[in-house]
Amino acid sequence: MKKLIATLFSLCVMVSLPASAVTLKEAQTQGIVGEANSGYVAVVQQGTPEVERLVAEVNAKRQKEYAAIAKRNNIDISQVAARAAEKLEARLPKGEYYQDNLGRWKQK
């Protein structure tokens, strides 16, 4: 479990690095992108094609990492994604958006 948590933390740092002209952190700070309850990021409000590409890139990286974690731990990828969603929401800075269990966007 400690290895899983360490890996999830590393993943969060990795996907926060710039993926295009707009970074994930910038998009989250501006309220354009938020942490979805699925363990992936999603567009909170109208996004540009650049933001849509950023979201797709980040989610592809997360999906790949979640799959590797799931395989190592012999669990389903949905379990990894759900646990990641909990961790990401807990670490989210004040003012950024997350999706609650009912799918509503909330500002922390």
Regions found by a protein language model. Name each.
Residues 2-3, 62, 83:
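Basic side chains
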Residues 11-13, 69, 88:
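Broad structural signal for hydrophobic residues in well-ordered alpha-helices, predominantly aliphatic
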Residues 55-70:
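Short, well-ordered alpha-helical segments
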Residues 1-20:
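Classic N-terminal secretory signal peptides
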Residues 22-53, 73, 77-108:
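Amphipathic, charged alpha-helical segments and their helix-to-coil junctions
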Residues 2, 59, 90-91:
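Short linear sequence motifs
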Residues 12, 54-55:
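A generic structural signal for short
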